[in-house]
Amino acid sequence: DRFFQAAGIMLLEGYGLTETGPVLSVRKQQHPVIGTVGPLLEDIEHRVVDQNGVLLPPGKKGTLYVKSPQIMEGYYKRPDLTEQVLNDGWLNTGDIAVFTVNGEFRILGRSKETIVLLGGENIEPVPIEDKLNASEAILQSMVVGQDQKFLAALIVPDMNKLEEYAIKMGINYVQNEELLSNPEIEEYVHDEIQSLVNTRNGFKHFECIYRFTLLSSQFEVGRELTHTMKIRREKVSQLYHREILKLFI
């Protein structure tokens, strides 16, 4: 934003979903507020709620719900998916938003687990992660790819299995970091991923993992995991922001 502003180029950023027709908001040309996607268009109601469904005031971030005649009636022949996102006309966008007192708002990330690729494909990461974690070489994983062309993954490997493989293949190393960056180890994990997540096992081609990075630390409760052992995706995305960026360069 500030780069284009310094160059004298006005950006009128907007926001919307395929399910919403699609445009919900756009910055006003007369008063473009940097860092926002503008105010909502006319006839669009909104709510920002916390994880318990409690309505939040401006300045507080939460999940954005919208209601309008332009909202879809449902997913074609998928009442199960429709029921997950639509309730009494209110659509759960799955996005985390915060509104200003003047009505503009910012999108801060995702609240739902669903990943939406650049091409519009909706992907549920948990079945993919469950399959990855079935590998004896993988302890934990998190699939990433929001607004990207393909999926990638953060992989927490089982170091004992990697060490066994290194001994078997005659791979020399001093520290774990050397082992994790070894091309033969990367190929070993790559082959594990490809053998599990593929079209033969019922996954669509866009659900396959095209890139990955190996992490040296396990996900921990209170940090990357909730007390029920679910991944805190927003937190993990923050902690491993650089690693995720490199996956899509």
Q: Where are each of the predicted segments found?
A:
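Short coil-to-beta-strand transition motifs
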Residues: 38-43, 91
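AMP-binding/adenylate-forming catalytic core of the ANL superfamily
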Residues: 68, 73-74, 96-205
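Active-site glycine-centered loops adjacent to acidic/histidine catalytic or metal-binding residues
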Residues: 16, 38, 95
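Conserved ATP-binding/catalytic segment of the ANL
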Residues: 47, 52-59, 63-117
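Generic structural signal for well-ordered beta-strand positions
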Residues: 56-57, 106, 123, 226, ...
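Ser/Thr-glycine-rich phosphate-binding loops at phosphate-binding pockets of nucleotides
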Residues: 17-20, 93, 226-228
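Gly/Ser/Thr-rich phosphate-binding loop
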Residues: 1-32
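Conserved C-terminal "lid"/linker of ANL adenylate-forming enzymes
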Residues: 115, 140-142, 190-249
